[in-house]
């Protein structure tokens, strides 16, 4: 059975953001605006996405 994945794209800059939010973007594997990564849909990943919801776009 295939695991569910979620596509996350960074839409805003991390400059001037809280250090914890910048670290969360790094933890998600995002490096720059427009960068998209495909991650496993787990509760921990969802929590990280919720923390920086205003800087990312999510596609299921």
Curated annotation (Swiss-Prot):
Pfam families: Ribosomal_L30 (PF00327). CDD domains: Ribosomal_L30. PROSITE patterns: RIBOSOMAL_L30 (PS00634). The keyword Ribosomal protein applies. Keywords: Ribonucleoprotein, Ribosomal protein. One of its GO terms (biological process) is translation. InterPro entries: Ribo_uL30_ferredoxin-like_sf (IPR036919), Ribosomal_uL30_bac-type (IPR005996), Ribosomal_uL30_CS (IPR018038), Ribosomal_uL30_ferredoxin-like (IPR016082). It comes from the Bacteria. GO terms for cellular component: cytosolic large ribosomal subunit. Gene3D superfamilies: Ribosomal protein L30, ferredoxin-like fold domain. Coiled coil: none annotated. Signal peptide: none annotated. Belongs to the universal ribosomal protein uL30 family. Part of the 50S ribosomal subunit. This is Large ribosomal subunit protein uL30. It comes from Shewanella sp. (strain ANA-3). The lineage of its organism: Bacteria, Pseudomonadati, Pseudomonadota, Gammaproteobacteria, Alteromonadales. The gene is rpmD.
């Amino acid at each position: 059975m295939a695991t569910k994945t979620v596509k996350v794209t960074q839409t805003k800059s991390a400059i001037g953001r809280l250090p914890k939010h910048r670290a969360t973007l790094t933890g998600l594997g995002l490096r720059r605006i427009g960068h998209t990564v495909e991650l496993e849909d787990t509760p921990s990943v969802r929590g990280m996405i919720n923390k920086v919801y205003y800087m990312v776009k999510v596609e299921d």
